[in-house]
């Protein structure tokens, strides 16, 4: 039962991160299309956002392995 719970936790955290990263990148592309001169600033903010979104699945994996 613990293995199933760990697999579900890892899968859902990866799914959430994928959706979050897709939304962040799509909004950044829209912003660059509207204001090309703000590309550098938008890319920096995008990378910070992606880093924060990717931290959650890593924490989820660690918690899943700790529960085994």
UniProtKB/Swiss-Prot annotation:
GO terms for cellular component: plasma membrane; proton-transporting ATP synthase complex; proton-transporting two-sector ATPase complex, proton-transporting domain. Belongs to the ATPase C chain family. CDD domains: ATP-synt_Fo_c_ATPE (cd18185). It is found in: Cell membrane. It comes from the Bacteria. Its main location: membrane. This is ATP synthase subunit c. F-type ATPases have 2 components, F(1) - the catalytic core - and F(0) - the membrane proton channel. F(1) has five subunits: alpha(3), beta(3), gamma(1), delta(1), epsilon(1). F(0) has three main subunits: a(1), b(2) and c(10-14). The alpha and beta chains form an alternating ring which encloses part of the gamma chain. F(1) is attached to F(0) by a central stalk formed by the gamma and epsilon chains, while a peripheral stalk is formed by the delta and b chains. One of its GO terms (molecular function) is lipid binding. PROSITE patterns: ATPASE_C. It comes from Staphylococcus saprophyticus subsp. saprophyticus (strain ATCC 15305 / DSM 20229 / NCIMB 8711 / NCTC 7292 / S-41).
């Amino acid at each position: 039962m613990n293995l199933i719970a760990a697999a579900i936790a890892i899968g859902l955290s990866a799914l959430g991160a994928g959706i979050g990263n897709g939304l962040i990148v799509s909004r950044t592309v829209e912003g660059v299309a509207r204001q090309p001169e703000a590309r550098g600033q938008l890319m920096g903010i995008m990378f910070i956002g992606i880093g924060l979104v990717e931290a959650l699945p890593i924490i989820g994996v660690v918690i899943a392995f700790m529960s085994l």
